């Protein structure tokens, strides 16, 4: 089957159409803006899969309806999913704008004095607002000379932020969320909302019973040679942790081997269900070889599977990581307990950064007073105001140990195309695989156990659905924290020390939900959250605006907030603007 092509970014150079001197004097400068924009994006961006982003420039500058239509025809034939219109001069507003209502769009009006690029920008944005097709405004802070072909830093930041978020929108459109199973233990996020996926994300939901996973394992609907490779890889790389089960629940060596084999098979089969596997077609299993075109998935597990079969912890953790027995590769997005809304937050984070995501319970707020009472030691540094314990038995990516290193040698989580095999091995070496606790998981399994290094910047996010309002997004930028070993051991032992831990300290503002760490925990909208590497809350805000998802909680500096220009017409309070604009325009793919 032909592989679906990646979305491209279309660059639209627009120009004053008056011939006999005006247009001719602007052709080169206008087209150079388009070429510079394309070069910037091509150099500095990649798709989440690691492929270079392609830009498509209109064949000619656009002065009116005819050239605009010719540009649209070219873009339609080349899978353009995002557009950036550029100009250094006055042009004819509504005659030259991109009118596709579902395609993210921005306009860069050159800040120069010779020609009124700012005037076109304002006129075009007014047309967008009047027609109900929001667009992002890009206008440099400082005046440039007409022959200056450089892109100022503030313009570059907006171009790249818009492009990252726009490509995320385009990449999700037409894909599916694979729901393996149904509702897990009454968790609301696993009550998968088809309307949300269809209307806000442009995605479908593929619902598959967990018996399909059972069938694939039992009937050997997988690559048997790959299974042997996966087992050999696990034998080489897995370190096993303490078995905390009572003696009557401990498994013997043969039973543990069977659990490991099934856990790896679950990873293989869920992957094949998501993206397909041509090896299955070679076995005559053509239907199964196609997969479900899934860009994200969730596995119910508890309790209808886990009371009898090995849990999904190993499968989920490996799929969400940037490496496995096939080497370093793009992480998948698989939500434990089929929490589709946390899965969407994971999907957003992966699409924006290309990195693996940490899925976790937002489990416990530890106040400085409580920590000192329990451990006899005081919190300090980033942790001085308290910490949140992020921990879950399931799908935290092994990258979350933060054994990868940035250019300064600091711990981080890299995009998969930057990860070396040595860094992947270091993450594996920092992970123990602990037998699942029988009281929770009667069918057994292995949970990954690691501790995230401290001082790493993270952004915690979550999507929630509110009846009568729709989806909302929560964002909390902060840092991982490294506690003294004795303190960590005492606190960790009070929950489940066989699971991966990240100690998280959000950045406080002294206001609202970020008054203190307790308020962050108290205002979090669900039991799960996602950690994405870096302080990238501004990118999430831009993406949410494109999808018409209001942000109900964030601690991003106001200067970094970048939304369509029409948001400013929805009141004077910046967050109220967001709610009113999202309500006014409705979901991007409204039905």
Swiss-Prot record:
EC number per UniProt: 5.3.1.25
InterPro entries the record matches: Fuc/Ara_isomerase_C, Fuc_iso_dom3_sf, Fuc_isomerase_C, Fucose_iso_dom1_sf, Fucose_iso_N1, Fucose_isomerase, Fucose_isomerase_dom2_sf, Fucose_isomerase_N/cen_sf
Cellular location(s): Cytoplasm
GO cellular component: cytoplasm
Gene3D superfamilies found in the cross-reference section: 3.40.50.1070, L-fucose Isomerase, Chain A, domain 2, L-fucose/L-arabinose isomerase, C-terminal
Main localization, broad class: cytoplasm
One example of a Gene Ontology biological process annotation: L-fucose catabolic process
Binding site for Mn(2+): 337, 361, 528
GO molecular function terms attached to this record: arabinose isomerase activity; L-fucose isomerase activity; manganese ion binding
Catalysis performed (reactions): L-fucose = L-fuculose
Known role: Converts the aldose L-fucose into the corresponding ketose L-fuculose.
Subunit: Homohexamer.
Protein name as catalogued: L-fucose isomerase
């Amino acid at each position: 089957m032909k592989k679906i092509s990646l979305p491209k970014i279309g660059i639209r150079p627009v120009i004053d159409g008056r011939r006999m001197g005006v247009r001719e004097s602007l052709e080169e400068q206008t087209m150079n803006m388009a070429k510079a924009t394309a070069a910037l994006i091509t150099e500095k961006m990649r798709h989440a899969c690691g492929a270079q982003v392609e830009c498509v420039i209109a064949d000619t500058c656009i002065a009116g309806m005819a050239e605009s239509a010719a540009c649209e025809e070219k873009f339609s034939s080349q899978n353009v999913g995002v557009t950036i219109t550029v100009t250094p001069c006055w042009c004819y507003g509504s005659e030259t704008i991109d009118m596709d209502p579902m395609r993210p769009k921005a306009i860069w009006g050159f800040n120069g004095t010779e020609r009124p690029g700012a005037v076109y920008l304002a006129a075009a944005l007014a047309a967008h607002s009047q027609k109900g097709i929001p667009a992002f405004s890009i206008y440099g802070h400082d005046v440039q000379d007409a022959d200056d072909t450089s892109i100022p830093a503030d313009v570059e930041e907006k171009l790249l932020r818009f492009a990252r978020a726009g490509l995320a929108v385009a990449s999700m459109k037409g894909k599916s969320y694979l729901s393996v199973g149904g509702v897990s233990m009454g968790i609301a996020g696993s009550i998968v909302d088809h309307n949300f996926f269809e209307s806000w994300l442009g995605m479908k939901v593929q619902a598959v019973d967990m018996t399909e996973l059972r069938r694939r394992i039992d009937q050997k609907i997988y690559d048997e040679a790959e299974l042997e490779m996966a087992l050999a890889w696990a034998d080489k790389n897995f370190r096993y942790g303490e078995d905390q089960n009572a003696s009557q629940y401990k498994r013997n060596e043969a039973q543990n081997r069977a659990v490991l084999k099934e856990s790896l098979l679950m990873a293989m089969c869920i992957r094949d269900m998501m993206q397909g596997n041509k090896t299955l077609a070679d076995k005559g299993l053509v239907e199964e070889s196609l997969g479900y075109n899934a860009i994200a998935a969730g596995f119910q597990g508890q309790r209808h599977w886990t009371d009898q079969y090995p849990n999904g912890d190993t499968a989920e953790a490996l799929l969400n990581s940037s490496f496995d027995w096939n080497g370093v590769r793009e992480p998948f997005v698989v939500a434990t307990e089929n929490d589709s809304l946390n899965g969407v937050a994971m999907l957003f984070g992966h699409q924006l950064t290309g990195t693996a995501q940490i899925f976790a319970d937002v489990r416990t707020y530890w106040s400085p007073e409580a920590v000192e009472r329990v451990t006899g030691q005081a919190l300090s540094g980033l942790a001085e105001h308290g910490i949140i314990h992020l921990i879950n038995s399931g799908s935290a990516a092994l990258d979350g140990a933060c054994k990868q290193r940035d250019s300064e040698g600091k711990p981080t989580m890299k995009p998969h195309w930057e990860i070396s095999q040595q860094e992947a091995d270091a993450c594996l070496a920092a992970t123990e695989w602990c037998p699942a606790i029988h009281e929770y998981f009667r069918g057994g399994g292995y949970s990954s156990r690691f501790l995230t290094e401290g001082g790493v910047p993270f952004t915690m996010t979550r999507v929630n659905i509110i009846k009568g309002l729709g989806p909302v997004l929560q964002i909390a930028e902060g840092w991982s924290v490294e506690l003294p070993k004795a303190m960590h051991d005492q606190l960790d032992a009070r929950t489940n020390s066989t699971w991966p831990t990240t100690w998280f300290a959000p950045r406080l503002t002294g206001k609202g939900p970020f008054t203190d760490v307790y308020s962050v925990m108290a205002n979090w909208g669900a039991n799960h959250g996602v950690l994405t590497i870096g302080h990238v809350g501004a990118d999430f805000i831009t993406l949410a605006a494109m999808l018409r998802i209001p942000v109900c909680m964030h601690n991003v500096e106001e200067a970094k907030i970048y939304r369509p220009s029409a948001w400013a017409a929805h009141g004077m309070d910046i967050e109220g603007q967001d709610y009113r604009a999202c309500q006014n325009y409705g979901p991007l793919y409204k039905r």
